A protein has these predicted regions:
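Mixed-charge (Asp/Glu-Lys/Arg
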Residues: 1-37, 43-137
């Protein structure tokens, strides 16, 4: 028998995997680092490399302000669930560059420009082009 996965750990893990999947949809590879350095994911697009911190909440946008000292992008994941079942296609991912984190309000309307929707290719590709530009996000 395996050890149980506590709900907060399951929520965070789902968020990290959803970010990886959404990024991969648009040609960005992302994976957790081998050692826990405080960054949840390292993402690659062409020659550009970015570190991501992922904050995940169920049925709301995370208000957690605890962030590591070094990261490039804050990924906020809003998991939608009904009766304990997560709907990945209805869940939302927002990629906020570190330079905008302090000024960004954590509500869906204010974060719209940072959303990485699975079904709006033009918006998602433009966002990723900005975040992974040679000069950095």
């Amino acid at each position: 028998m395996a050890n149980p996965l506590p709900p907060p750990l399951a929520t965070g893990t789902l968020g990290e995997i959803l970010v990886q999947l959404r990024l991969l949809q648009f040609g960005v590879q992302a994976a957790p680092p081998i050692k826990d350095t405080g960054n949840d994911l390292v993402a690659f697009r062409g020659r550009a490399v970015r570190t991501l911190q992922v904050k995940t909440s169920a049925n709301r946008v995370s208000r957690d302000r605890r962030l590591p000292q070094h990261y490039d992008i804050l990924a906020l994941v809003f998991l939608r669930s009904t009766d304990g079942v997560v709907a990945l296609d209805s869940s939302r991912v927002f990629l906020v560059p570190r330079s905008s984190v302090n000024g960004a309000r954590r509500n869906v309307t204010s974060l719209a420009q940072y959303e990485l929707p699975y079904d709006n290719v033009d918006h998602s590709m433009a966002l990723l082009a900005r975040l992974f530009s040679p000069g950095g996000p």
